[in-house]
C-alpha cells in the first residue's frame, strides 16, 4: 500500500499541554533512530535513488536543512507573528546541497546537533508563548508550539518510513 504524500496529509492539532515534554523527548530521539538505521549501510545503498526520489543521505540531509525553518518558526512564536514563515515547498536547499557527497556519520551527527538545539529552544519557551498560536502558511490553520512539535515529529516519522522503504527496496533487489 502506498503511503500518503506529505503534502496530502491532514493535521488535527488538539494535543494537550501535558504531551509537550513527551513530544520533545521523541524529537530528540529521531537522530539516534536514524543513526541506528543507516550507520552500517554500504555507501551504494545510502546514495541510491529509487524512482528518482531522494536517497537515504538526501532524506537525512533534508531533515537537517529543515531545522533552520523550525528554529525560525520558534522566533516567529516569540515575536508574536500572526503567520509563521513559509517553508520552501520546492526543497531547493536539499536539492542543491549534494548530501550524497557527505559522510553519513557526519550527516547524522550534524542532525543530532541541530535537533538538540531546536529541542533546547522549545524547552525554554515560557507559558505565554506555549499557549500562543500562529497560522501555518501551507495548512492555513492555527499552530501552537506543541502543534509544531507534533508536526515536526510526524515529518520525521514520514522520512524514517521513507528510509526504511529505501533499505527494504535495495535489499530486495540484492
Whereabouts are the PLM-identified features?
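Short, contiguous alpha-helical
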Residues: 1-14, 45-90, 133-174
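Compositionally biased, intrinsically disordered low-complexity regions enriched in proline and serine
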Residues: 8, 12-14, 21, 100, ...
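Short coil/turn linker and secondary-structure boundary residues
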Residues: 15-18, 41, 54, 99-102, ...
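Amphipathic, non-membrane alpha-helical segments in soluble helical-bundle scaffolds
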Residues: 17-27, 57-60, 101-108, 145-149
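Short, contiguous, helix-prone interaction/anchoring segments in small proteins
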Residues: 19-52
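Charged, low-complexity, helix-prone segments enriched in Lys/Glu/Asp/Gln
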Residues: 20, 92-95
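Acidic/histidine-rich alpha-helical segments that form the ligand environment
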Residues: 25-31, 36-37, 94-132, 152
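Structural signal for well-ordered, non-membrane alpha-helices
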Residues: 31-42, 68-71, 75, 112-126, ...
